[in-house]
């Protein structure tokens, strides 16, 4: 009897226990709450997950989260976000609903007086470019942002006088630039770095720099190579700066409140001293000026109104006198002398404006209406005579004697007006973005240019029965067309037991009424960070990228009796590039300093290409889709605090690009640069924050080149490598960031910096292009056009 009672009791207990276990496994628990930082501000997109499961969520704009998960005896909830410390909370047998409010401290480390923060994980091809030491950086071209970009992986430059750059085998025209989400443009007639003037990007107004060398998102428009995405400041309070140097001056002023922000900036640039180091001597008188403003007003949380304006004037006057160039080898050294008569006078006036109106339905959904207008007026006029002598150095016997006359009367007016709307919707783990744009282009061009050469009394090219010019071109054309664009993309983030996944996918649809062309461009990027090693991230990007021809790509020519006429082709098509980019990123620490190593292997399948030649920074297109090719390479970059508290990086790129023109054999493209290395290094003196130093180093292997006005098959030569090191040193005369100075003139300033730059510190004679000399036997000599030599610049910066 007792045994029976015991068995019954034990059986009842076992049954109740089994029922409890079954009920426990089936029971759900709702986990919700909010994640904030140490300033009590919500942390958007913070990750909340239950360790060892697939349960989790991503915080919304308010830092709030909510998800449902199966309950357990013990649950470990992990809270994480890039740039913040990770926190874990343990829940013991939770039931029904649990509210968890967690604060994540900022991730920082103290090394003396220097604060070192963690490096953000990169889950897309868009890289955030550090601009901390840009104001201490020596820069000859005046384009401080672009000079930083040339030190990024996959980017190269061959002229310190120009702010243009090549990306992974693409031309200058294949790089798009956005300011506050609006695409901006460059002048079209520029043929040399001396003419280029100021970059449209004002470094004083920049808050953020994003750059992608390929595989970029669908929201970025119709360019094949790269995207530079600039965000201008919205200031709170009052700030400003005034700077002056031997190369120009600038002023910046910004003030704002919680609802209103306004910035104004002016720049003046003159490169007279720098151009004086060129081998062509004469009277250089370049004068560049621009004014920019950016204003933002938010009367309430629902509405935001933004206005941006740019006025830029660029006047270039040049009266050459003489030139002496020695070139060749030590065993075969030649000397080229020219005496000039005549002058050049160019004007490039640019106007740009944009208006944006944003309506926030709530913190998760918004719509923005955009209008922008761009207008350029360009004039290029020159009449230059030259008498030249070519002989062996130290020998009076002449290899070639002659004269030449270059003439141009070129005028171009262009305008681009766009109207568009963009929107975004945020969900728990999705970020949907979309937009539509109508763009209207109008270009009017009148160009007349020719070149005559005479060698020993004979006009070249020599003919017994008539007189010919080396080059004669006339172009009177107008273009008016409309573009229609639509894009949609989504970014999906999720946490799994094996790691975190970020997927960006989208597409563009475009229509161009010039040639009735409709294009579809799908794109996708996926990034995976394994849970076993959150310092490692793998990325893969692919997509179809079209480049709709702008005015220069549309021009074709016909030649009759040595007279060339330019016309616009109606059957021109968009060039196409299919990107495949496989990359990885690894974050690590050395002596408690953060570093990041990135590597990207890429292949670009190119079709419907419009071949071109490059002379200095001028790109001359064939005018037809007669080529196909490829670009393949490997880019590597190590970024981090080589010196505590400063950002430095070293990038190396290996690349090859070829094309087949009209089905012929493969030839190197004009941008076929096999090796490129760039260094940006910043430093300071120990135990003081008064001294700052930056070093920029560039090495780029030589590009293909050949005789002018000839086919690409004749470009069988290679330029010498481009090698340059620039040094910038700054000393802080006054430090008043904490406003501890209350009396005297010093109280008006936060900092006063005195700087010295040494451009081309190694004094290397780099070659930018070649001037070809022909004798009566039609033998040609390539005379190098050297760039600037060593030059010292002094600058003074007042910050208030």
Regions found by a protein language model. Name each.
Residues 496-498, 603-605, 624-707:
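Gram-negative outer-membrane beta-barrel transporters
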Residues 85, 92, 98, 121-175, ...:
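Periplasmic N-terminal accessory/gating domains of Gram-negative outer-membrane beta-barrel systems
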Residues 298-313, 343-515, 598-601, 649:
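Face-selective signature of the C-terminal outer-membrane beta-barrel domain
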Residues 699-706, 731-800:
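C-terminal beta-signal and adjacent terminal beta-strands/loops
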Residues 366-372, 571-625, 630, 754-759:
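Membrane-embedded beta-barrel scaffold of Gram-negative outer-membrane proteins
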Residues 241, 247-268, 281-320, 344-373:
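Transmembrane beta-barrel wall of Gram-negative outer-membrane proteins
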Residues 34-39, 46-51, 80-85, 94-138, ...:
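Short, acidic, small-residue-rich periplasmic hinge/interaction motif at the N-terminus
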Residues 54-64:
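Short, acidic Ser/Thr/Gly-rich low-complexity loop/linker segments typical of extracellular
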């Amino acid at each position: 009897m007792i045994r029976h009672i015991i068995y019954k009791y034990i059986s009842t207990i076992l049954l109740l226990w089994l029922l409890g276990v079954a009920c426990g496994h089936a029971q759900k628990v709702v986990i919700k709450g909010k994640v904030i930082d140490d300033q009590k501000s919500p942390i958007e997109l913070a990750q909340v997950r239950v360790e060892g499961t697939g349960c989790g969520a991503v915080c919304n704009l308010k830092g709030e989260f909510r998800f449902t998960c199966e309950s357990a005896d013990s649950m470990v909830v992990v809270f994480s976000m890039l740039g913040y410390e990770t926190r874990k909370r343990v829940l013991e047998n939770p039931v029904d609903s649990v509210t968890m409010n967690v604060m994540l401290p900022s991730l920082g480390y103290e090394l003396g007086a220097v604060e070192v923060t963690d490096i953000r994980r990169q889950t897309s091809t868009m890289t955030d470019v550090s601009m901390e030491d840009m104001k201490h950086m020596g820069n000859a071209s005046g384009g401080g942002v672009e000079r930083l970009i040339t030190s990024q992986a996959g980017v190269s430059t061959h002229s310190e006088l120009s702010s243009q750059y090549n990306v992974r085998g693409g031309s200058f025209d294949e790089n798009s630039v956005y300011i506050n989400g609006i695409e901006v443009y460059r002048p079209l007639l520029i043929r040399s770095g001396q003419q280029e003037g100021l970059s449209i990007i004002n470094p004083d107004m920049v808050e953020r720099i994003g750059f992608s060398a390929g595989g970029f998102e669908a929201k970025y428009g119709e360019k094949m190579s790269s995207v530079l995405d600039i965000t201008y400041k919205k200031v709170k309070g009052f700030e400003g700066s005034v700077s002056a140097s031997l190369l120009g001056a600038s002023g910046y002023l910004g003030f704002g409140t919680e609802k209103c922000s306004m910035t104004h900036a002016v720049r003046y640039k003159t490169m007279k001293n720098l151009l004086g180091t060129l081998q062509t001597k004469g009277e250089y008188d370049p004068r560049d000026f621009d004014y920019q403003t950016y204003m933002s007003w938010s009367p309430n949380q629902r509405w935001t109104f933004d206005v941006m304006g740019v006025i830029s004037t660029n006047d270039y006057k040049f009266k050459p006198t003489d030139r002496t160039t020695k070139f060749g080898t030590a065993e075969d050294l030649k000397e080229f002398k020219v005496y000039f008569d005549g002058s050049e006078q160019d004007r490039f006036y640019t106007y740009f404006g944009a208006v944006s109106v944003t309506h926030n339905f709530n913190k998760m959904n918004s719509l923005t209406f955009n209008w922008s207008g761009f207008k350029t007026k360009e004039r290029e006029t020159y009449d230059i005579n030259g008498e030249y002598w070519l002989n062996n150095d130290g020998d009076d016997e002449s290899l070639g004697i002659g004269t030449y006359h270059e003439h141009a009367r070129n005028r171009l007016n262009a305008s681009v007006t766009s109207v568009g709307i963009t929107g975004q919707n945020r969900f728990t783990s999705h970020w949907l973005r979309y937009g539509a744009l109508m763009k209207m282009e109008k270009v009017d061009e009148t160009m007349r240019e020719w070149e005559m050469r005479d060698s020993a009394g004979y006009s070249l090219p020599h003919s017994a029965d008539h007189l010919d010019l080396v080059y004669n071109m006339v172009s009177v054309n107008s273009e008016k067309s409309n573009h229609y664009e639509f894009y949609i993309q989504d970014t999906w983030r999720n946490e799994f037991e094996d790691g975190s996944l970020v997927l960006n996918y989208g597409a563009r649809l475009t229509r161009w009424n010039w040639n009735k062309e409709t294009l579809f461009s799908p794109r996708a990027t996926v990034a995976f960070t394994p849970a076993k090693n959150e310092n490692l991230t793998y990325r893969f990007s692919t997509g179809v990228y079209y480049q709709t021809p702008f005015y220069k790509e549309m021009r074709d020519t016909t030649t009759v009796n040595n007279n060339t006429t330019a016309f616009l082709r109606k059957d021109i098509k968009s060039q196409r590039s299919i990107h495949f980019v496989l990359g990885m990123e690894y974050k690590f620490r050395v002596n408690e300093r953060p570093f990041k190593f990135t590597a990207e292997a890429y292949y670009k399948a190119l079709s419907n290409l419009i071949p071109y030649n490059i002379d200095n920074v001028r790109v001359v297109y064939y005018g037809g889709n007669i080529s196909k090719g490829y670009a393949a390479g490997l880019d590597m970059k190590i970024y981090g605090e080589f010196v505590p508290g400063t950002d430095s990086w070293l990038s190396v790129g290996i690349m090859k690009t070829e094309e087949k023109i009209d089905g012929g054999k493969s030839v190197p493209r004009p941008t076929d640069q096999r090796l490129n290395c760039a260094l940006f290094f910043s430093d300071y003196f120990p135990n003081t924050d008064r001294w700052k130093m930056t070093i920029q180093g560039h090495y780029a292997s030589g590009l293909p080149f050949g005789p002018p006005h000839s086919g690409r098959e004749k470009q069988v030569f290679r330029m010498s490598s481009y090698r340059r090191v620039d040094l910038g040193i700054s000393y802080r005369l006054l430090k008043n960031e904490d406003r501890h100075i209350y009396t005297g003139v010093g109280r008006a300033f936060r900092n006063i910096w005195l700087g010295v730059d040494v451009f081309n510190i190694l004094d290397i004679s780099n070659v930018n292009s070649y001037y070809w000399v022909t004798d009566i036997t039609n033998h040609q000599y390539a005379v190098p056009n050297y760039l600037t030599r060593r030059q010292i610049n002094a600058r003074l910066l007042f910050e208030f």
